[in-house]
Amino acid sequence: MKLGKNRVLQSILVCQQKGTTRRSGIAPLTTRCMAPPKVLLFGSSGGTGRYVAKFALEADHNVIAFVRNPAKLRSVLRQVGVSPALVENNLKILEGDLTDLNAVRSAVRDSVLSHANGDVIIECAGKPKGCQILAGKPMLLPAVRAIAETMREIGLKRILIQTGAMSSDTRLYRDPSYLFKACLVTFMSPLMCIKGMVSDNYALVPYVYREMDDLEWIVSRPGLLAEKPSRSTDAKALGVAWSEAFVTSYVDLGEWTAKAVFNADLVHTSPSLAYVKRK
């Protein structure tokens, strides 16, 4: 990643935003930032991740993408319309696998992330679809545990983790469909060829709730995802709702995620997402 002249000038500007949010006095992440906040992104070449990268780059963030296949990432970013200049100047690629926990820890340590600068982590990786009866070996829980432990080491706070509509936990006392979702995970997900993906998310969420409250986590729970044109209009956009949309466009989820990670009002929440009236 190379910084051009304009980016160097931006990096020495100090932006100030005063005040805190009403949620537990959590200060905005952009307070006194010396450079555009960095986004360390896991799952950047996936259906959602490519759009998270696109909107984060277009919002002037420096994006650090942890990915197995750098060539694939560059290809999908071209496909979704990211300008070559943004890729050249604002994107840094770290090659690695989410199952390699040492590589995951190194990515967090070596990215030089700073809570004071408003830097964040977004985790939107997941197991691919596959017709299977058993869930298989968990992938996300060990990876997120490694990320969380390393965040504590370096003093970083904010992380957004994408799960799914079937993800639930007894602490989600406002979720009236808890038992129904537990049934879906056990019996219906194999028929939908998403057993591995759903079970991975289902195992991860309780860990986040019970072991990560010292961090500023956000857990998103979108419904069925599809590669469709944006459904956002002048009147409606993807946002927090009581129940999830039946189908959510990857592009809309990517745009929401790239913004939501910086929203302190969402810290320690697990929002369902649907198309709601713009505020």
Language-model region placement:
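Mid/C-terminal beta-alpha module of Rossmann-like enzyme folds, strongest
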Residues: K38, K157, A241-K279
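N-terminal Rossmann NAD(P)H-binding glycine-rich loop of SDR-like oxidoreductase domains
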Residues: L40-H61
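Conserved Rossmann-fold NAD(P)-dependent oxidoreductase catalytic core, especially the SDR/UDP-sugar
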Residues: S45, P70, Q132-A135, R145-K195
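Conserved beta-loop-beta element that borders a ligand/cofactor-binding pocket
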Residues: V205-K228
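NAD(P)H-binding glycine-rich loop region in Rossmannoid oxidoreductase-like domains
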Residues: A71, S75-A146, T150
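Glycine/proline-rich active-site loop of Rossmann-fold NAD(P)-dependent oxidoreductases
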Residues: D169-Y173, P229-D234, F262-T269
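Conserved glycine-rich Rossmann-like NAD(P)H-binding loop of the short-chain dehydrogenase/reductase
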Residues: N62-A71
